[in-house]
Structures are given as structure tokens and as C-alpha cells.
Amino acid sequence: MKVILLQDVKPLGKKGEIVNVSDGYARNNIIPKKLGVEATPKNLNDLKLQNQHADKVAQENYESALALAKVVENTKVVVKLRSGEGGRTFGSISTKEISAAAKEQHGLELDKKKMQLNESIKALGNYEVPVKLHPKVTANLTVSVVEG
């Protein structure tokens, strides 16, 4: 019997796959536990429609990430860092401060977890901070750390 998996089933496959299993295994294990449904023409059509919808949503997310990347690339965020005599700084700038400054100055809601900053910024100057907006889209945000 052919079955469409509704969840990942360890020995059989992943969600959305069509697998061939014995009739007894399907009727006594897969279908009652709602791990899958029989691959009838109606269910196959529903699966096809779900896949088309998922592809469309993924494409829209990708396009919106590209549009946001263009905005992020052209944005300069200014963050103030306390400093003393001789240019010695106190404290550091983390992704949390950069995210808050981007929201305050430009209205950009950037997730601090998506900023790929290896270590905190501890000196004055200009920095490029990579922001992963989508698995395929990364943009560089310009951060200017000034004396404040």
C-alpha cells in the first residue's frame, strides 16, 4: 500500500514523502497513529497543492529577504561607545545594541541572533556586520561606532 507520510517516520522517510509499506503496517500502525494517510488520488492532489503553496511561500520569503537586503546594504547605523582619554573605550557593542540602534534610527527590525558578529566591537570606527536574512541571503550592515 502506498502511504503519504504526515510526519517524519524514522525507518520510512520524511514528511510529505510517498512510501510503499505492507497493508497491515499501514492499517495497524501508520494510519491509526496519524503518521500517514493512504495515497488516494484525492490525497495525492492535496499533497501536490500543499507543495505548490509551500513553494510559493518560500519564493515570497526569498524575494522579501532580497528586498530587505538592499535596504540593509544601504543603511548606516551609528552606535555610541563611551571612551576616555587617549581613545580608550569602556564596554563594548554587541548585536543587541546594533539591533536596537537599527530599529531606533531606521525602523529596521533585525534579529540580533541573525547578525554574525564573532566578538563584540570594542573600538571606535566603521564595521561591516553580516546579517543572515534568509538561508540564501546575507547582507552587510554598516555600523559606525562613535565616541559618546
Swiss-Prot record:
Keywords: Ribonucleoprotein, Ribosomal protein, RNA-binding, rRNA-binding
A single BP term in Gene Ontology: translation
Gene3D superfamilies: Ribosomal protein L9, C-terminal domain, Ribosomal protein L9, N-terminal domain
A GO MF label: rRNA binding
UniProt GO cellular component terms: ribonucleoprotein complex; ribosome
InterPro entries, per database record: Ribosomal_bL9, Ribosomal_bL9/RNase_H1_N, Ribosomal_bL9_bac/chp, Ribosomal_bL9_C, Ribosomal_bL9_C_sf, Ribosomal_bL9_N, Ribosomal_bL9_N_sf
Task of the protein: Binds to the 23S rRNA.
Record-stated family: Belongs to the bacterial ribosomal protein bL9 family.
PANTHER family noted in UniProt: 50S RIBOSOMAL PROTEIN L9
Protein name as it appears in the record: Large ribosomal subunit protein bL9
Organism of derivation: Agathobacter rectalis (strain ATCC 33656 / DSM 3377 / JCM 17463 / KCTC 5835 / VPI 0990) (Eubacterium rectale)
Lineage of producing organism: Bacteria, Bacillati, Bacillota, Clostridia, Lachnospirales
